[in-house]
């Protein structure tokens, strides 16, 4: 768990995308990404901030972005915002759908707790607008 989260952040340090697209037409729950169960979800996210895009997708999947260690690590490394603001499109709450977590999710939450700094949590700076929506929705 620790290695994967740190590797995600190391990769983001090396490759800084100028645009992130998340195709959420289908997701995977449970033992993903290989042995999970596919779920039709029907949403998409586009952002200039990879961390904010993942935080929004995490929220839409019914998880708390604060429980995902790489989002916290990336935020503290200055690689992006682990909050989303300025969502353009439909309200994320309208496409929120709870996914079954991976069996190792609780271990990841414990690792995340060890990362949490003592004292007040710093406020995230404003992100560029996130474009999120349902591919079947009309503008």
Place the predicted regions along the sequence by residue.
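Extended, low-polarity segments enriched in aliphatic/aromatic residues
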Residues: 1-139
């Amino acid at each position: 768990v620790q290695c994967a989260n740190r590797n995600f952040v190391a990769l983001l340090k090396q490759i800084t995308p100028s645009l992130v697209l998340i195709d959420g037409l289908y997701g995977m729950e449970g033992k993903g990404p290989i042995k999970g169960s596919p779920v039709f979800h029907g949403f998409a996210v586009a952002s200039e901030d990879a961390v904010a895009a993942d935080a929004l997708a995490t929220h839409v999947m019914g998880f708390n972005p604060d429980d995902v260690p790489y989002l916290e690590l990336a935020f503290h490394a200055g690689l992006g915002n682990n909050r989303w603001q300025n969502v353009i499109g439909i309200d994320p709450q309208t496409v929120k759908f709870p996914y079954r977590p991976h069996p190792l999710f609780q271990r990841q939450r414990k690792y995340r707790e060890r990362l949490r700094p003592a004292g007040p949590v710093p406020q995230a700076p404003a992100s560029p607008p996130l474009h999120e929506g349902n591919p079947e929705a009309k503008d």
